[in-house]
């Protein structure tokens, strides 16, 4: 047994430290499509913040790189370990510690899956609303990537729904940031700095999340449009109406066809309409009162028809849920039809038509294709890229990311930089900002052990 194996085992116990062939293959990767799997030298499963602190202190003193893992649902490679490194799995730190209805918060450990948090709050009339599409994803992963998802148009992303953290620094020191309140104006906001840092600054061991009223009545309207510009012209009208949709998604015709064929969707849309439309707008509403929901759905349908929709299909209950669940799998449907990479750029909402039309043109010029869907309400584009020539694909991705930034957007809206996008980030982002980020990283992690290679590409 090596010295480090013995030290890590002493901290978490022999049963909770894995090495060699005992490390599961799943621990070698997340859901990033292009990065090669890499097993760590050690995989530890701590049960307490104190054990995490001891692991980090030992790793820091011995120069062992550390990668944190929640559910492994990330799409950018931030949970892919480093050769010779330590993977810290939060499988055992998976408890909802408290549901505080008076303050409308829950206190949870980082390994809690969204499904378990939803179950824990089901009888309270409250819920955690961040909905990144993978309900098996962990709250810690949500924090690490600043996850968003379909409900961000109404409820915001993770940083809008996290009020406080407990985190462990690479030195083994444990800090608390924020609290069970919306206001803190005392020094720098370390909560927000750690959110979205992809495990490069500190490891989160406890999260205080905001809970919102649980609205039990839900319905959706799906509207096909002949022209994508009409879809995007309808979005600000819907948002300005006061109806407050919790989901507002566009789906292009190619992606919808893939969803229908791979997910066995029955939407009742005639073939001639499906063949003639360019894109769809999905509007989901929720309410405590069924009659009010019905009135709002009727209003949305009428608005969409006035704004140029070919038709408006009301989906309730199981049919609405099935479409939303299928939308969550949109990229995997596109992948089944030949896509080999994904981007999640974000641009100002009004720039989406220009971004999408230009990106498709760039893809066609590279003998490829760019199709997809996205969060029309917040400008986050999920585009599946098909381009078989590796050099052409790399240039295409660079050009699309550059286009997003030229339009005032960013390379990633919710998946993060991870390992997959470091080259694009370093090439296209403001070097002054990158330098400042490096200094922040150095301040938190002077030994450079936390997720080396993530964000900055340094290993």
Swiss-Prot record:
Which superkingdom does the taxonomy of this entry point to?
Answer: Bacteria
Region (Disordered), start-end ranges: 28-47
Key word DNA-binding present? no
Names of the cofactor(s): FAD
Gene Ontology annotations for the cellular component aspect, listed alphabetically: peptidoglycan-based cell wall; plasma membrane
Q: Under the GO molecular function aspect, what terms does this record hold? A: FAD binding; oxidoreductase activity
Q: Which UniProt keywords apply?
A: FAD, Flavoprotein, Isopeptide bond, Oxidoreductase, Ubl conjugation
**Has keyword Oxidoreductase?**
yes
Q: Which residues form the FAD-binding PCMH-type domain?
A: 35-214
The enzyme's E.C. designation: 1.-.-.-
- Cross-linked sites for Isoglutamyl lysine isopeptide (Lys-Gln) (interchain with Q-Cter in protein Pup): 354
Q: Which family does it belong to?
A: Belongs to the oxygen-dependent FAD-linked oxidoreductase family.
Q: Which PANTHER family match?
A: GLYCOLATE OXIDASE SUBUNIT GLCD
What this protein is called in its record is Uncharacterized FAD-linked oxidoreductase Rv2280
Give the source species: Mycobacterium tuberculosis (strain ATCC 25618 / H37Rv)
Upper lineage is: Bacteria, Bacillati, Actinomycetota, Actinomycetes, Mycobacteriales
């Amino acid at each position: 047994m090596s010295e480090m194996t013995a030290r890590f085992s002493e901290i978490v116990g022999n049963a909770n430290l894995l090495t060699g062939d005992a490390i599961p293959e799943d621990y070698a990767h997340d859901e990033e499509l292009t990065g090669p799997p890499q097993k760590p030298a050690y995989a530890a499963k701590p049960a307490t913040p104190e054990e995490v602190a001891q692991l980090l202190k030992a790793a820091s003193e011995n120069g062992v790189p550390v990668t944190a893992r929640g559910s492994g649902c990330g799409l950018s490679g931030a949970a892919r370990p480093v050769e010779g490194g330590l993977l810290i799995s939060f499988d055992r730190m998976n408890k909802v510690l408290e549901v505080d209805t008076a303050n409308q918060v829950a206190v949870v450990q980082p390994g809690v899956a969204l499904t378990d948090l939803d179950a824990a709050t089901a009888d309270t009339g409250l819920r955690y609303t961040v909905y990144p599409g993978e309900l098996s994803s962990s709250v810690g992963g949500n924090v690490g990537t600043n996850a968003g998802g379909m409900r961000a148009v109404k409820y915001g992303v993770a940083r809008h729904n996290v009020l406080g953290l407990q985190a462990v620094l690479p030195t083994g020191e444990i800090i608390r940031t924020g609290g069970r309140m919306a206001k803190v104006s005392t020094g720098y906001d370390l909560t927000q700095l750690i959110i979205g840092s992809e495990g490069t600054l500190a490891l989160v061991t406890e999260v205080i999340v905001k809970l919102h009223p649980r609205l039990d009545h839900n319905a959706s309207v799906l509207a096909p449009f002949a022209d994508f510009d009409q879809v995007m012209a309808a979005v600000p009208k819907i948002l300005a109406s006061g109806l407050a949709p919790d989901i507002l998604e566009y789906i292009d015709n190619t992606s919808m066809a893939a969803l229908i064929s791979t997910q066995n969707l029955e939407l009742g849309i005639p073939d001639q309409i499906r063949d003639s439309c360019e894109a769809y707008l999905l509007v989901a509403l929720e309410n405590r009162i069924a009659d009010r929901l019905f009135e709002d759905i009727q209003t949305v349908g009428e608005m969409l028809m006035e704004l140029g929709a070919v038709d408006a299909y009301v989906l309730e209950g199981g049919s609405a849920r099935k479409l939303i669940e299928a939308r969550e799998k949109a990229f995997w449907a596109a992948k089944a039809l030949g896509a080999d990479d994904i981007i999640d750029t974000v641009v100002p909402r009004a720039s989406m038509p220009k971004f999408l039309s230009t990106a498709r043109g760039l893809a066609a010029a590279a003998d490829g294709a760019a199709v997809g869907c996205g969060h029309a309400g917040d400008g986050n584009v999920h585009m599946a890229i098909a381009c078989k020539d590796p050099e052409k694909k790399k240039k295409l991705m660079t050009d699309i990311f550059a286009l997003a930034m030229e339009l005032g957007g960013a390379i990633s809206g919710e998946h993060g930089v991870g390992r997959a996008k470091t080259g694009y980030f370093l090439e296209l982002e403001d070097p002054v900002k990158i330098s400042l980020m490096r200094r922040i990283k150095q301040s938190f992690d002077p030994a450079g052990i936390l997720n080396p290679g993530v964000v900055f590409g340094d290993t």
